[in-house]
């Protein structure tokens, strides 16, 4: 049976994986660091205890980067502002990760929205 502690742990893991993904995406896109190097040196990524959490972060970040043009086009179509005017800049990365989960990954809609809001 699932108890409150289990639910809390699952929620914490979901939020943590998204925070680590955001940090990695920010470092790669805004600081022009190589993706493999960022994975190897990211304290947040290294600290993830579960291999499935590390795999999820890798999948989300690599898919976001691979599909960046498509994701940015979807955001541009849905936003009143040009992507370059979305502030703070990390908000654009949060939107990118959310769109990636909704469109390109098998993440349930409620989970993607809940974890990215």
Enumerate the language-model features and the residues they cover.
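Class I Rossmann-like S-adenosyl-L-methionine
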Residues: 1-117
């Amino acid at each position: 049976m699932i108890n409150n502690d289990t639910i809390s742990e699952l929620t914490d893991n979901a939020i943590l994986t998204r925070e680590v993904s955001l940090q990695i995406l920010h470092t790669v896109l805004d600081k022009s660091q190589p993706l493999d190097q960022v994975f190897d040196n990211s304290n947040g990524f290294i600290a993830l205890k579960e291999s499935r959490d590390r795999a999820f972060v890798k999948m989300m970040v690599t898919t976001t980067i691979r599909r960046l043009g498509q994701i940015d086009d979807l955001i541009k179509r849905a936003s009143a502002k040009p992507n370059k005017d979305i502030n703070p800049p990390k908000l654009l990365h949060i939107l990118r990760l959310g769109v990636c989960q909704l469109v390109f990954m098998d993440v349930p809609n409620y989970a993607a929205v809940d974890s990215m809001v």
